[in-house]
Amino acid sequence: MDLKPPAKRFIPFRKRDILQLCLDDGKLDQAQHTAFRNCSSLMQALFHFEFHQRLERLKDSFSSFNPDRDTHSLKPEEKHCDAFIQELEPLLDKANFEKVSEADLARALCEDSLFKIKLHVDFDEFAEVLLYCRGESIRTESVPALFGLKRHQVQFANYDRVVIYIRFKDDLDPKTAAARDIKPGSVILKLFKNVPKADLEMLFPNTTVRMRLIDKLMIGVPAAISGGVVISTKLGATLVLLGSLFGFWMGMHSTPVELDKAALIALFAGLGAVGSYLWKQFNNFKNRKLRFVQSLTQNLYFKNLDNNAGVFHRLIDDAEEEECKEAILAYYFLLTHSSAMTATELDQQIERWFREILNCELDFEIDDALDKLKRLQLVSEAPNGTLTAMPLPQALSTLDQHWDQLF
């Protein structure tokens, strides 16, 4: 199986570092450094204002079904999950998350778990499920093998970030809801880090741990062998006695069986030994399952980054960073190029720069970056499709006018 991840839209560097890399590139003189920094600061301020408005809309649309809400409403509010989703999905796209399709999720559910745990998710309890991921990469992990006697290296596809949105059905079974402390029709929004692609099912709130065939065999085979030993040593005399009683009662022989005190003690001792053995095997099974649940819980504890409203606060910050980086890069490469460029040429130059300077395979979002520059009037497009950046002095003036128009 080819584990090579696709080129990513997400730019895995901070906007401050991207700005410094542009300044260190050597194509701007010292006077232009200050002007370029000022242009970048104004762009960041404009994007920050836009995303602040997005944040307010998200807070308003989420408040009616926010499970962590600690404020009171002045009047009854209707739940509008659709309005929230209409705000959330474009935000995830701006933050360069990719949607996990139903087919991708189905494939992930069929793959072997990295943690060697068999998990089951009941999707019939959900009215709506959304999964988004960002930063797919190939990682290597050391995992135990041969019953823990040795370890070996395995490669697996990993998501750096995963967002999951779940809305439970309004007609969720009351017993199920009470057992899992879930309110019918409620919503869960979570953000996780470092999630193996094959273990996406562990993120769902109703995930149950099941024993794999190998785990059942590890308990069952030794149990069968030791059980045979118990029966032959502890229950042999008891079985002979019970067989004689059964034969006498069924008329298979006429010799009566005497049940004296010694026979009764042997009978109950044998039954007690078998009962004790069965109880021990049941506890072995239960304890092994508890260890699996503990392993799952520990993994989720360290992978969970945020919940509910905290998730879209983080996403707002991520999306704002991505918008700033894309705009700064596109403007810088147009500004420092000796002639006008087409969108394709600009895209290829930026991606080549990341590959050669930063050893990073990037699928730069050229269309989105140019849309921002055009909206800010920082780039002009000729009839033949070539693009030219506005010089720094005019760009500063234009951005300043945009800022003044906000208030």
Predicted features, each with a name:
Residues 392-407:
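Short, amphipathic alpha-helical interaction segments positioned at domain boundaries
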Residues 359-371:
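Soluble catalytic regions of membrane-associated enzymes that act on cell-envelope
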Residues 370-384:
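A short, conserved structural fragment
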